[in-house]
């Protein structure tokens, strides 16, 4: 009877240890994945910022400068998408990526307006609004370095 009780206690302790380990992993393991994603995405965007392909929207940009900025953004976007995105916190990242696409579309509209002699001022204002929204969503997704990438 005594050895049966000892075995039962050891089995109970083993189950308790496994449960505590699982709870600890779920509670603390996932944020590490989120932090790793955010750190790697921020690093990719910081590297792009250092490439000098930014556009200053306080002045009238050239089509070439906009194209270089768009290409740098697309390169950063492909690096971000190649990262393993955590399941938790995926919604803010998805909203940021959507805003990133909207900003890229605004860059194209501004390029077209410059090339066709169209209405540049409204296209520039639209781009500035999209960049502001993108920066807010990047901060919410814990990747602030990616907000407004290549657009000053």
Predicted segments — roles?
Residues 12, 27-30, 98, 102:
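Intrinsically disordered, low-complexity regions enriched in small/polar residues
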């Amino acid at each position: 009877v005594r050895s049966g009780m000892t075995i039962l206690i050891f089995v109970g302790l083993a189950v308790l240890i496994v449960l505590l380990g699982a709870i600890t992993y779920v509670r603390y393991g996932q944020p590490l994945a989120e932090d790793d994603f955010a750190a790697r995405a921020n690093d990719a965007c910081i590297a792009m910022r250092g490439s000098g392909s930014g556009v200053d929207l306080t002045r009238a940009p050239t089509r070439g400068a906009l194209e270089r900025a768009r290409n740098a953004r697309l390169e950063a976007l492909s690096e971000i998408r190649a990262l393993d995105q955590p399941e938790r916190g995926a919604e803010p990242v998805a909203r940021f990526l959507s805003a990133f696409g909207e900003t890229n579309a605004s860059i194209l509209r501004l390029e077209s307006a410059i090339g066709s002699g169209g209405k540049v001022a409204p296209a520039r204002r639209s781009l500035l609004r999209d960049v502001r929204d993108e920066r807010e969503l990047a901060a919410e997704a814990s990747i602030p370095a990616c907000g407004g990438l290549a657009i000053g």
